[in-house]
């Protein structure tokens, strides 16, 4: 299996539901591929069906009597799969024939060309959608999707395709209104969360709305425009358009595309994933009045009724204790505010910047380094006697990256591994000084330069870390989930607890997240509320140099660099 290291544009073919005419559909794809040279193809709806797909069809594909010339991706659709396909997948995985990949009812896949595809098959049945997970039985013959499927897929992708339509797709469109499938709320919410470049559905008719902008919360350099396309059934009697060819561009600056002039606002803005029926007390996590732990997902939820609380109003401080004042322009911004791009030459977390404060750097690895912050939260007075420095340190990727997920796969793995190695080394240092490690991170697509904050908490106080974070999240109206981030996930606040538990708050579209939240919580745990604003804690250069030397002495037994 060949994966291509560098992202390049790819020509893609999508066809409407073949309704079981799988051989005819594959031959059609093969003919077009000979003419145009597609990189991969997607089959919407029911590529296979119990009624029209014969066992002979399946044998032809498996034995390559009918060859699939390029990777072709499909989902379960609404008709289920033939038993022979289900049995094959149980034994051999999703490749049901050479180059033919089934993504099941709920699937997320990276193509050979490193584009990501999310797929939600099956139909929407309200009763089954809201069933408790332990009562919901799903198989490749099951024709319904569950709310947990929608949750799993809610991450950035290049292409999204589904069997059901999203509701309100014509919202904000200036095209003449048409009679289209009603659609359902979960698909609208999924589209809002995935923010795909292309969203395809099988339709009774062909329909293509104007492209829409997802949100300014995603940096213009990572793409914000979605093309929604519904394709008529494969070779339909009305001769409506059933195939769609396009060039898919990587979301990189090299291939940045301007927004089309006919772009509209998104029809799916502010669509949280529905997890409870409207008739129940808890409609969706954001509307519940009680902070609780979900039995099904271990997620922690809180109402946004208290969004006017003091914590939610505090956005005038800096997002982090930086190596200098670079990020002053971020003060008071919400996720959807745009700002000019900061390159490595002007980023004060980049070692290539001639103005970087070198005296604050305490260790340099191959992929990441550590530096002391300007204006540390902790001091030797707040720490245990054994810790002869402030102990507050930043772990920073050497590569200029707003988030780890913006790095290539190889760099992502290497950088994450080394950052975790630094985190463990500092944790060991803290532990030897009768302290635990509090680590937190803000990851944003439109951030400047990702970093992790590490703060020592004396063991006598560390039992309060989780309760304080949850308490302050409740006051601010933030939703925490007990899980780690998915590979290449974007837009979240993460806190690593000494117990090994990880809490995630997903930063929502247009959310005004308190960029000082992590430092504010740490200050409350330590009784250092007067040191929340890092600018009030700035030291002289001589004091910083002395602090740096003190940290290096403490860290020397654990320094692997």
From Swiss-Prot:
In this chain, composition skew of type Polar residues spans 320-337
- Modified positions (Phosphoserine) are 296, 317, 319, 331, 334
UniProt-listed SUPFAM superfamilies: HIT-like (SSF54197)
Q: Which GO terms describe its molecular function?
A: RNA lariat debranching enzyme activator activity
Please, which domain of life does this record's source organism belong to?
Answer: Eukaryota
A GO cellular component annotation here is: nucleus
Q: Does the keyword Nucleus apply?
A: yes
Region named Disordered = 286-338
Q: Keywords in alphabetical order, please.
A: Meiosis, Nucleus, Phosphoprotein
- Indicate where the modification Phosphothreonine is found in the sequence: 298
| Cross-referenced Pfam families | CwfJ_C_1, CwfJ_C_2
Q: What is its main location?
A: nucleus
- InterPro entries this protein is in? Cwf19-like, Cwf19-like_C_dom-1, Cwf19-like_C_dom-2, HIT-like_sf
Where does this one sit in the cell? Nucleus
Q: Single Gene Ontology BP term? A: meiotic cell cycle
Function statement? Has a role in meiosis.
Q: Which family does it belong to?
A: Belongs to the CWF19 family.
PANTHER family, alphabetized: CWF19, CELL CYCLE CONTROL PROTEIN, CWF19-LIKE PROTEIN 1
Provide the protein name: CWF19-like protein mug161
Read off the lineage from the record.
Answer: Eukaryota, Fungi, Dikarya, Ascomycota, Taphrinomycotina
């Amino acid at each position: 299996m060949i994966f291509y290291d560098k992202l390049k544009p790819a020509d893609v073919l999508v066809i409407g539901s073949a309704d079981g005419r799988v051989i005819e559909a594959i031959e059609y794809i093969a003919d077009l591929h000979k003419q145009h040279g597609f990189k991969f193809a997607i089959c919407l709806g029911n590529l296979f069906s119990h009624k029209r797909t014969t066992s002979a069809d399946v044998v032809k594909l498996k034995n390559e009597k009918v060859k699939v010339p390029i990777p072709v991706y499909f989902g379960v659709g609404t008709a289920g799969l033939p038993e022979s396909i289900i049995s094959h997948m149980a034994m051999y995985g999703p490749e049901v024939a050479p180059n033919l990949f089934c993504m099941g009812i709920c699937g997320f896949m990276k193509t050979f060309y490193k584009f990501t595809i999310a797929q939600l098959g099956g139909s929407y049945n309200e009763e089954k959608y809201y069933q408790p997970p332990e009562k919901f039985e799903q198989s490749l013959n099951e024709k319904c999707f569950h709310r947990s499927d929608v949750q799993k897929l809610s991450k950035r992708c290049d292409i999204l395709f589904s069997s059901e339509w999203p509701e309100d797709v014509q919202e904000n469109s200036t095209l003449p209104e048409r009679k289209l499938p009603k659609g359902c709320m979960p698909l609208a919410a999924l589209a809002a969360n995935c923010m795909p470049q292309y969203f395809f559905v099988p339709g009774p008719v062909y329909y293509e709305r104007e492209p829409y902008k997802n949100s300014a919360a995603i940096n213009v350099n990572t793409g914000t425009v979605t093309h929604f396309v519904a394709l008529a059934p494969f070779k339909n009697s009305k001769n409506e358009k059933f195939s769609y060819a396009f060039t898919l561009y990587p979301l990189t600056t090299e291939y940045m595309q301007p927004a089309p002039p006919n772009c509209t606002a998104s029809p799916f803005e502010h669509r949280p994933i529905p997890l409870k029926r409207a008739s129940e007390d808890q409609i969706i996590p954001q509307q519940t009045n009680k902070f609780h732990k979900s039995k099904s997902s271990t997620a922690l939820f809180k109402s946004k009724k208290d969004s006017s609380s003091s914590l939610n109003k505090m956005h005038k401080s800096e997002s982090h204790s930086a190596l200098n004042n670079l990020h002053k322009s971020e003060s008071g911004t919400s996720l959807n505010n745009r700002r000019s791009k900061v390159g490595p030459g002007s980023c004060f977390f980049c070692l290539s910047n001639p103005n970087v404060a070198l005296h604050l750097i305490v260790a340099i690895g191959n992929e990441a380094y550590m530096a002391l912050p300007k204006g540390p939260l902790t001091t030797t007075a707040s720490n245990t006697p054994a810790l002869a420095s402030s102990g507050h340190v930043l772990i920073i990727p050497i590569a200029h990256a707003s988030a780890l997920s913006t790095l290539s796969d190889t760099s992502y793995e290497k950088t994450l591994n080394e950052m975790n190695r630094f985190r463990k080394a500092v944790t060991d240092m803290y532990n030897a000084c009768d302290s635990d490690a509090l680590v937190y991170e803000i990851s944003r697509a439109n951030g400047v330069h990702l970093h992790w904050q590490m703060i020592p908490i004396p063991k006598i106080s560390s039992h309060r870390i989780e309760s304080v974070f949850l308490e302050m999240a409740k006051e601010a109206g933030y939703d925490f989930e007990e899980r780690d981030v998915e590979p290449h996930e974007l837009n979240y606040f993460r806190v690593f607890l000494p117990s090994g538990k990880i809490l995630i708050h997903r930063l929502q579209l247009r959310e005004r997240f308190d960029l000082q939240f992590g430092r504010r919580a740490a200050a409350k745990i330590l009784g250092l509320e007067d040191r929340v604003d890092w600018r009030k804690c700035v030291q002289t250069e001589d004091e910083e140099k002395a602090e740096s030397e003190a940290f290096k002495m403490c860290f020397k037994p654990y320094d692997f660099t």
